[in-house]
Regions:
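Extracellular/periplasmic, surface-exposed regions of secreted and cell-surface proteins
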Residues: 1-159
Length: 159
């Protein structure tokens, strides 16, 4: 596996923050046409407690920050040869070892992608009580899973 990684973070006036990260991964577990995957994330936050309209409540609300992030990451298949068929010689035909295909090729095998969204609030009250609220959702696309095949094919499943 080969990876290229980069990130960029920016803060302004101790109130506003933004971030971006990018990752490009390549793996020999996938076919040459689908070997490389691009994965990224963006984030932003706003410290409301630094705003002038929060000054009347600064003895109660010590710190308050709104956060949001969205991004995609990838997973690889667990096997090494999923994108091309494999053969074995565990059987005999007419008294001699005979090779037979034990796994079907899947040239379309690609990265499984997880898209995640996180929204949150960090809150500090009276400089003593810290609270964190998060809402999180994740959607998976191109799920890597074994699909059952008809037994007449001679194979049980394909990835």
């Amino acid at each position: 596996m080969v990876s290229y990684v980069g990130s960029l973070n920016y803060g302004y006036n101790d109130k506003y923050y933004a971030g971006f990260s990018f990752r490009r991964d390549g793996s020999s577990r996938l076919a040459p046409d689908t070997r490389w995957g691009n994965f990224w994330a963006v984030s932003a936050s706003w410290r409301l407690s630094q705003e002038n309209f929060m000054k009347p409540w600064e003895n109660v609300v010590s710190d308050m920050k709104l956060r949001a992030s969205y991004g995609v990451n990838g997973n690889l298949p667990t096997g090494y040869y999923g994108y091309h068929g494999t053969y074995t010689t565990g059987a005999f035909y007419n008294g001699k070892p005979a090779p037979w295909e034990d796994a079907i090729a899947n040239p379309d095998l690609t990265w499984e992608k997880n898209y995640a969204l996180n929204l949150g609030v960090d809150l500090s009250l009276f400089r003593r009580v810290n609270l964190t609220f998060d809402w999180y959702t994740r959607t998976t696309k191109d799920l890597l899973m074994s699909k059952q095949l008809n037994s007449i094919s001679g194979f049980g499943s394909i990835l």
